[in-house]
Amino acid sequence: MAFVDVDGVRIHVQDLGDGPAVALVSGFGLDHELWDRQVRVLTERGFRVLCVDQRGHGFSDTPLHGYDIDRLAADLVTALDRLEIGGATVVGHSFGGQVAFRAAATAPELVTGLVLVGSNGVRASRSESFPFGEPPGPLLQSLLADEHINRVGARYRTIESAFAHEPDPRTVDWLVRCSLRMPSWAAVACYRSLLTTDLLADIERVVQPVLQIIGATDPVHSAKGARWLRRHLRAATLVEIPDCGHYPMLEAPDAFESALLKFITA
């Protein structure tokens, strides 16, 4: 376990193994625990694995401010730089995919490869230029209201509804427990960043190899949006996992790990 100080905010990094570096960045509300199986699989295959808890998440600090994509990406880049990894494949899930995408665009010397998991990278809501997902206004207001009225219930609904099939209640309880480490002020700020950030202009700046892994029935980020992004990136490979929702690392771990290992060992 390590902590990296970024302008007075401690960012938690679980740093295990030796070899080429793979950094894992979780999505909204989740943290290093999400990747437990993948940490074991990757370290057994000879990789150094860094699970980075974003500010407001996991064991990282939870300041009142600083949850815009630029700040979160800067946290990630600073952590990788301070740990002197030389370069890493960065794997970003959902909201973490947007953060990883911005980091790849701004620090290609540190982000040498990019994996987007259940994430379209550039947007999480519909716009004229990106006609996928829901319009941001009503969705954002609904999420903010739910978080304000019943934080615990809101986290349960958000997590349960993201699976392709009814999940094991024990899995949901575990993910909600992780999610509740994130205080409401961080959640509200991250929802705003998630649904209002547009990274389409970064597409031209992402020159690294990119792997996209998405569940074919992901109810959060559509496979159509992932296909659109693949066509616009310079060097992208898309893996669609059948009958899988928003959590490929949990719902289809064998297929997920096979795709990831093929990419990082190529």
What role is predicted for each listed range?
Residues M1-A23, E44-F47, I85-G86, T112, ...:
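Alpha/beta-hydrolase fold catalytic core
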